[in-house]
């Protein structure tokens, strides 16, 4: 497929860039007036570019600057490939960065392996269950020089919105990447939460974004609505998912608020920008305050945002006054 060819070429180019440039494409933080003030070198390893993960990175960088730290950011994307994430993490270790900030589960798993035997701390975000994904062994007392902020969304509350939207919704569908442990966790949690409120769940696993059209078509024949978990493969093609769902008259609810701008009907979830900011605060504790990382528990964001796409409301024939939209911010 053309997409896969482009992906492979992009991955080759990325590997070459890492080797030849030594991750030199960083951005400089705000410089303090005191010339003796330490400049920290932070490696940012992002699994793939899409609005949610981009927002986490922006939140992290913005907050580091807001706190007045001098930081050189070494910013790399793995283009969705674990092999690239491993290369990036290994290069950061070779460059002796002061801290590695990872965005998404696979990037965190790769960095965990790379920092073994070093004193380089790692802060992760955009991970749903770091214990299940074997990034940390405990959420309260972290180990291996690793801590971070999880992106777990209020699954039960999101599912209840389907029932508020239309009492006729009895089954919701989920499309997910079978190779992402983050997604496996969410699928199981969604099934459990759905059972509590009397909803059935149909799932379709994918291995490529090229599988999405068929997956949506399959879901449309088995389910009354589509629930979007925080799956990076699905998120990278979220505008396509939204378009296909609307064509099939499937109401969509997402765990990620950034998806609403791409045409998803609604979301009540965490702010990826905020978990990026919260990760920066942890990084400051480690780098500046010299807090023992083992005493910094894995954190979860308390900041939720409820957003509704007004155009999608109209296209699907819902009333703006629907109970499900109560208290929401409407976006065009």
List where the protein language model places each region.
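Hydrophobic alpha-helical segments within soluble ligand-binding/sensing domains
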Residues: 129-171, 270-291
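Beta-alpha junction/loop-to-helix N-cap segments that form part of ligand/metal-binding clefts
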Residues: 77-137, 231-246, 250
């Amino acid at each position: 497929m053309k997409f896969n060819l482009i992906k492979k070429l992009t991955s080759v180019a990325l590997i070459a860039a890492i080797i030849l440039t030594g991750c030199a494409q960083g951005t400089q933080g705000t410089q303090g007036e005191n010339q003796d003030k330490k400049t920290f070198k932070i490696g940012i390893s992002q699994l793939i570019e899409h609005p949610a993960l981009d927002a986490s990175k922006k939140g992290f960088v913005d907050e580091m600057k807001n706190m007045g730290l001098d930081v050189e950011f070494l910013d790399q994307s793995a283009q969705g490939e674990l092999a690239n994430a491993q290369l990036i993490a290994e290069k950061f270790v070779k460059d002796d960065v002061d801290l590695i900030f990872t965005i998404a589960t696979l990037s965190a798993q790769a960095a965990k392996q790379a920092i073994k035997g070093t004193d380089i701390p790692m802060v992760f975000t955009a991970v749903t269950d770091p214990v299940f994904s074997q990034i940390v062994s405990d959420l309260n007392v972290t180990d291996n020089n690793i801590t971070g902020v999880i992106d777990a969304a209020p699954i039960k509350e999101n599912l209840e919105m389907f029932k508020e939207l239309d009492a006729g919704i009895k089954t919701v569908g989920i499309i997910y990447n079978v190779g992402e442990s983050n997604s496996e966790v969410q699928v199981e949690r969604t099934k459990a939460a759905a059972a509590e409120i009397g909803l059935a769940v149909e799932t379709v696993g994918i291995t490529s974004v090229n599988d999405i059209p068929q997956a949506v078509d399959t879901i449309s024949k088995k389910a009354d609505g589509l629930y979007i978990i925080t799956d990076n493969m699905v998120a990278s093609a979220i505008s396509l998912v939204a378009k296909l769902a609307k064509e099939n008259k499937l109401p969509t609810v997402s765990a990620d608020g950034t998806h609403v701008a791409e045409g998803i009907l609604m979301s009540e979830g965490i702010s990826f920008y905020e978990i990026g900011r919260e990760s920066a605060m942890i990084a400051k504790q480690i780098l500046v305050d010299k807090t023992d990382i083992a005493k910094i528990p894995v954190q979860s964001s308390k900041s939720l945002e409820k957003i509704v796409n007004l155009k999608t409301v109209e296209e699907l024939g819902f009333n703006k006054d629907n109970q499900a939209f109560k208290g929401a911010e409407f976006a065009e």
